[in-house]
């Protein structure tokens, strides 16, 4: 890890909290609990006041100064302002006292709720500044930065005494705070703690894990969203946007529902407009549908592996904080991969991956469309010439050759101009409960700031062909 820097001398002195002192703190805490409002969900729109506490251990002090944490928190505010399209405004208060927790760091491994509680109690005992006291009373969420790296960045090695970064809920609220994130101040280089901070804060807002749990070999939603493996994009320093479903759940996107055939649908990128398209997957199950979003490598999405239309197969009947992506055959969120390879569900061991450039859907580029138009014109001219030749002289063989050449050019033109079709023939589109695939997405434009496509929707109980006519 290299040499660590200590807390700068102009920072407040660390507050050591022993057992006897915690007993006195309990009286203050009980009073704060009595004054606390009833438990309620953290708001996902408007202002969200957050208290940030810096906490060291008796056997390991913090290695970074206050400016370091101010930068991390500032980036968190900017990130969620972007991905929520300004609908959520995090209002952080970086607390004055830097506290020292009462137990050694090894005692907090797999005990995030205890770590958060101890940090909040120590802070409440040390807070004398009116702004700190007010933040403790009014904040609706808590972030505790603890000393040292997080276990998540060295699962298969490193120091087993490093606690995990985690989201947790306090058994008893402290002030108005019920939910907390405990975050390592750093990760093992070259990894950054920012992606982990953003991910765990997503849990505080109510989002589930969207990667496969435990020892599962598949990848859930992969790198295509913050709550999946996107946490680690750019070595954890540049996590992507949340996926379309997560934004829908939080109220951060406008949903355009298309339940009948519609041509010329336009969809800007998620970095430019908060819009997604929803298409019913089953006439009998409203909880099952497709969500479409336009992703481009810009803004927070700069490190994505590719650009284009992401088509999500959603089934909200599958739920669970840690189990939503557990079963690769039936997940809350399934990415309908444009390449049809199912790499996310196969996992690395079977030759899969966490997402690649051929997962998003996109139409042919402009040069292919132009070449297709030229091929179509040449094919039509060839057929016309063959007809004229046949009218003048019944030489069958040359005429047939001209007809074949013209037909081939027309076929090439069709392939070049029309591009891929997502429909009944596409892996991952079939409704989980059986029944026909009722939606086809075709005639896609190239990936770009605004994509255009057609949506064909069959009446209930009927299906549509998966290939372009």
Show which residues each predicted segment covers.
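Fold-level signature of zinc-dependent metallopeptidase catalytic domains
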Residues: 42-70
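Selective detector of the "anchor" transmembrane alpha-helix that sits immediately C-terminal
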Residues: 370-391
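Extracellular low-complexity, Gly/Ser/Thr-rich intrinsically disordered linkers
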Residues: 270-366, 411-466
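Internal/C-terminal transmembrane anchor helices
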Residues: 398-413
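Acidic, glycine-anchored loop motifs typical of Ca2+
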Residues: 129-142, 469
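Bacterial N-terminal signal peptides
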Residues: 25-34
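Extracellular hydrolytic enzyme modules, especially secreted metalloproteases
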Residues: 86-87, 136, 140-304, 315-319
């Amino acid at each position: 890890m290299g040499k660590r820097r200590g807390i700068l001398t102009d920072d407040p002195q660390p507050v050591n909290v022993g057992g006897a002192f915690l007993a006195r703190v309990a009286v203050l805490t009980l009073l704060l609990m009595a004054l606390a409002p009833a438990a309620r969900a953290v708001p996902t729109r408007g202002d969200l006041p957050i208290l940030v506490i810096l906490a060291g251990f008796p056997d390991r002090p913090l290695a970074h100064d206050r400016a370091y944490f101010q930068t991390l928190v500032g980036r968190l505010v900017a990130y969620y302002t972007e991905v929520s399209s300004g609908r959520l405004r995090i209002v952080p208060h970086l607390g004055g006292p830097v506290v020292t927790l009462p137990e050694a760091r090894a005692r907090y491994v797999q005990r995030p709720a205890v770590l958060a509680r101890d940090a909040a109690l120590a802070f409440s005992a040390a807070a004398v500044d009116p702004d700190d006291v007010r933040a403790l009373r009014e904040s609706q969420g808590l972030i505790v930065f603890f000393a040292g790296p997080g276990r998540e960045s060295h699962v298969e090695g490193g120091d087993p005494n490093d606690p995990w970064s985690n989201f947790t809920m306090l058994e008893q609220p402290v002030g108005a705070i019920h939910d907390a994130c405990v975050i390592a101040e750093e990760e093992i280089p070259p990894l950054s703690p920012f992606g982990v901070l953003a991910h765990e804060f997503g849990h505080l807002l109510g989002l589930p894990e969207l990667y496969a749990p435990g020892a599962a070999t598949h990848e859930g939603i992969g790198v295509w969203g913050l709550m999946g493996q996107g946490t680690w994009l750019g070595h954890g320093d540049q996590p992507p946007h949340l996926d379309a479903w997560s934004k829908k759940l939080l109220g951060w996107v406008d949903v355009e529902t298309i339940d009948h055939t519609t041509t010329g649908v336009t969809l800007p990128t998620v970095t430019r407009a908060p819009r997604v398209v929803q298409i019913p997957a089953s006439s009998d199950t409203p909880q099952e549908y497709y969500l479409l979003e336009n992703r481009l490598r810009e803004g927070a999405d700069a490190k994505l592996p590719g650009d284009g239309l992401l088509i999500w197969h959603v089934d909200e009947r599958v739920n669970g904080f840690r189990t939503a992506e557990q079963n690769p055959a039936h997940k809350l969120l399934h990415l309908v991969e444009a390449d049809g390879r199912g790499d996310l569900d196969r996992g690395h061991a079977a030759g899969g991956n966490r997402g690649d450039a051929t997962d998003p859907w996109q139409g042919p580029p402009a040069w292919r469309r132009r070449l297709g138009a030229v091929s179509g014109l040449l094919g039509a001219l060839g057929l016309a010439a063959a007809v004229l030749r046949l009218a003048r002289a019944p030489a069958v063989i040359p005429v047939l050759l001209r007809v074949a050449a013209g037909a081939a050019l027309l076929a090439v033109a069709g392939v070049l101009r029309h591009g891929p079709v997502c429909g009944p023939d596409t892996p991952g589109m079939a409704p989980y409960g059986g029944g026909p695939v009722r939606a086809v997405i075709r005639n896609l434009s190239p990936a770009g700031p605004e994509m255009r496509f057609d949506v064909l929707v069959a009446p209930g109980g009927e299906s549509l062909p998966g290939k372009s006519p």
